[in-house]
């Protein structure tokens, strides 16, 4: 069984959708506080539809509580930290039964100290640079130039987690994939590598 870990999720519909994915794949959902919503929120349950009552879900007071209750160390080999800041892609990783796929909050991702404690556990989902993925890429690049940003500063701006959803209306770019899409992509790769057990 695989484990999906959401560190400080903010959008209830994303958590509901991920919960539904966990039910149909037999994965365990771990929610690390603080949460940006109540688990009683109608939006969470609506997104999870009739699956929510069958969900195997555990909530934790924080990252240390999550590690302690699951017998993990910060750089444990069973952890896979999904972030845009990684060099290695998720497809280059080897997944084993019992692994934990960790995704950060929609607005800021996994906190820097957690990534810095385990750089070898960091993975990313490959995607186009934000400005290259839009029809208005030229407008974005012109906007960057008007702000005096160099290529280096643009790369710094792009350093957001793979799970980012929020788009600054002053920016002409997409921040990243939706959290529930990201979780499904990586979970199904892990299931593929292990032969889709029980499916």
Residue ranges: model-predicted function:
Residues 1-199:
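Post-transcriptional modification and biogenesis factors for structured RNAs
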């Amino acid at each position: 069984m695989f484990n999906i870990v959401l560190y400080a999720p903010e959008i209830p519909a994303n958590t509901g959708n991920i919960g539904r994915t966990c039910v149909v794949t037999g994965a365990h959902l771990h929610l690390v506080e603080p949460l940006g919503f109540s688990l009683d929120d109608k939006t969470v349950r609506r997104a999870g539809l009739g699956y929510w009552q069958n969900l195997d879900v555990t909530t934790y007071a924080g990252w240390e509580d999550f590690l302690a209750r699951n017998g993990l160390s910060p750089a444990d080999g069973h952890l896979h930290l999904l972030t845009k800041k990684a060099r290695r892609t998720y497809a280059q990783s080897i997944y084993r039964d019992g692994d934990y796929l960790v995704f950060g909050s929609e607005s800021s991702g996994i906190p820097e100290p957690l990534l810095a404690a385990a750089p070898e556990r960091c993975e990313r989902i490959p995607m186009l640079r934000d400005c290259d993925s839009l029809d208005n890429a030229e407008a974005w690049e012109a906007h960057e130039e008007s702000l005096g940003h160099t290529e280096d500063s643009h790369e710094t701006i792009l350093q957001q987690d793979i799970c980012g959803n929020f788009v600054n209306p002053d920016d002409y770019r997409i921040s990243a994939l939706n959290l529930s899409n990201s979780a499904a992509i990586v979970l199904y790769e892990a299931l593929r590598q292990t032969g889709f057990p029980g499916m």
